[in-house]
Amino acid sequence: MYIHERENWTDFHWENSAIDALIELASRKIGLLYGRLNNLGFDNKLRAMAENLTHDVVQSSEIEGISLNTEEVRSSIARHLGIDNLKYTAPSHYVESVVKVMLDAIEHYMQPLTKETLCRWQSAFFPTGFSDGFPIEVGCYRTHEEHIVSGIFGKERIHYIAPAPQLVENEMANFIQWFNQPPSTSSIVQSGIAHLWFVSIHPFEDGNGRLARILSDILLAKSDKNEFRFYNISAEINRNKKQYYSILEQTQHGNGDITSWLTWYIKTLIASVEDAETSVNSILNKSFFWQRNASVIMTDRQTQIMNMFLDGYEAKITSKTWAALGNCSKDTAIRDIQDLVAKGVLREEFPGAKRPCYAIVYDPEDLTSWFSDTQIEEENGTFYLLTTYKGKQNVRNRLLRLDAERYMKGDLSQQSLLNKYCAYLMDNPK
């Protein structure tokens, strides 16, 4: 029996004792994140949100097996938000449509949800009326049975059968009415319920997962009372896709007890906020760098390339990379780099190496004395820097894969690693 076949199936219940501590932790982390954002000016906040939205759009689509060009998405979002983008990539019509849905949801997050809005968003996901080469119903609720299956043709496994099409209109009316009411429980719990409830109705022929994640974000935005969105759950779901579908299937076959689902959902939300903290830290580091180097004279090319690396461009700083990014000769690149070394902006990572590479000097002080128990941890293919600042503040920052691999091979010093990911702490001592 599927969950929707039970009488009063949306009277979900759960064990508060199992999730109360998680709700408190999630709320505290969200509060700390927004507190940290007070250190950012408006332009930097906008850039942080743009980067978060870029990851959200790309990862949410990837969950459904759709690969989008990250630079196209980033360029589209930057244009809509009025942000200068040095690496503009003309977005496709499809990317533009998907981005507009996300921005529309953010801009109007306080407005009541309607059937018309949902149908408009779903239609924007499929501007040609096709999905995976097959025609689908767009801009309206589905009119046929919906089976969630996996496996090859002829040997499919049915994971879930959604409510019959003649029931969808009424089921969605109940959902929308509930969605628009003031929450009777924690907004974090409400967000998790909305996600589960919507995908269990599966009102559209395609696009339900992406819409469910947007609806979850809207409820969190209402709770935060903030149109700036700095965290999203899509990337974490994509990293743990098997767990996501497993817990979803388990709950949809259950008796209405959604404790396991909420536990998984809130833990995933917490992880997404931790990732957002890393992005904010990167922006704070960049701001800290430019404040320290405000009086340093650089050419336009030097400034542009430095900003690329400060924004997370994943490559070693070498004369070869510099020449490629600056569209200049290797000799010019060497002169650029040596000039910045002389000015204390860059330093040679391992002096005397046959193929020299360089590190950005965020803070000229050797930060290693301020940190202890520094290590790298891998979790679901993502690397994190774990360290303790001044013996009392635990730090956990997501690393670029290249930095993690270089550090573990001894090709990146601990000083450079801490400088790149933790220098912002020196500007905000505790």
Task: Provide a role label for each language-model segment.
Residues 1-382, 390, 414-430:
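FIC/Doc superfamily catalytic core
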Residues 386-410:
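Acidic, low-complexity, intrinsically disordered interaction modules
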